[in-house]
Amino acid sequence: MRTILKTALFAGAMSLMSGGASAACDFNNTSTVKSLSAGFEAWKAVTSAMAECGNVEAELDQEFRKKQPEAFAANPSLYHIGGVANSTAVPLIDAGTIRPLDDLVAKHGGQLKPNQLVRIDGKIMAIAMMVNAQHMMYRNDIFADLGIAAPATYEEVLAAAEKIKAAGVVDYPLGGTYKSGWNLAEEFVNMYMGYDGAFFNADLSPSINNANGVAALEMMKALTAYMDPEYLVSDSTYVQQQFQQGKIAMANLWASRAAAMDNADESQVVGKVTHSAAPTVAGGSTPASTLWWDGIVIAANISDADAENAFKVAMEGIDTEMVKANNDAAVWLIEGYEPTATAAGAFATAANGAKPYPASKQMSLMHTALGNGIAAYLTGEKSASAALADIEAAYTTAAKEAGVM
């Protein structure tokens, strides 16, 4: 089983044209529909649109990836709808706790685009609603005042950070999603792929304790010198708020957070943040980032009638009307989306050749091992090679237990 995101998804988003808006909700929902998803702006928009149908209970939680496996394994499932991404869909698919959607798409998904249909082994298992990637965001006013060009490489990021630090214009030159666990692992995945590193050997044994792995960790540590010293608690919301409060000058942050920079209700830097491609590293040509999709799945452990009802509610949440009301909240794959300046960084990252996140069962195990093991290097407890060796050992144990190796 493989979960794949093609850069064609970004091309598809670029080519979408406006369509006619539908009514607020095409039917009156009389059954309770529960959803569990992340809590960023796009999910707020989608779940608010679903709620217009009535009887919708939406749980928005950035720890959704930890809760979903057990919640969807319950019988009946604790939720009808799940919000997922490339990697977070994998454990649900492997466990058989979400259902194929082919029949429901045929009956109620006429508005969906071909590039929204996420197929696993020929079956539609998820509906993609948006694409996402981490890319460079920077304070255009500070960069202009200091004569700094938009950094295209991580070496240029370090040089820019040093100049900004010397100028003393912000609390910290750089922000980073380095929170221990999933976020920190994703930072390594991005950087390691920028070094063109391979995660596994042919037999799915680990392959990260090498020159590329050490170099990736060393670059990550070099960047932390310009971050808030509490970077190991810094997730996407933390970095977003650092930007909005004028505390940092740049970060490689998720495209789904771009619109928040210009939200006048909570941001002090409206119009001052520019979005560009994720940097390359060490002379490479591929951005040190990964491409993602976010979308919707339907629980397996509910009745067919409840599944159909939940799917209808979900379709109301990702329709053209929702996009027209929330165009800037994401790089939508939905009919009616019109790309804006806040999408520029995501499109540039894709156009420059960023690769899809390599979602798979073994990668889920590797991601967990990375998230648990990298901090020991950053804090000085272990050398880079020792940390990578321990991560490989942790992955090997988990992979053998899971039958991957």
Predicted regions and their residues:
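Hinge/lid segment of periplasmic solute-binding proteins
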Residues: 85-133, 158, 187, 272-276
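Glycine-centered hinge/linker elements that transmit conformational signals in sensory
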Residues: 161, 204-232
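Short, solvent-exposed loop/beta-turn-alpha elements that line the ligand-binding surface or hinge
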Residues: 99-115, 173-179, 195-216, 264-268, ...
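C-terminal lobe and pocket-closing loops
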Residues: 256-269, 281-372, 402-405
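Conserved N-terminal structural module of periplasmic/extracytoplasmic solute-binding proteins
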Residues: 6-9, 21-88, 232, 284, ...
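A structural signal for short loop-to-beta-strand junctions that line the ligand-binding cleft
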Residues: 70, 78-80, 108-143, 172, ...
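Extracytoplasmic/periplasmic solute-binding protein
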Residues: 125, 134, 158-206, 248
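C-terminal capping/gating helix-and-loop segments adjacent to ligand/active sites or protein-protein/ligand interfaces
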Residues: 57, 119, 344-398
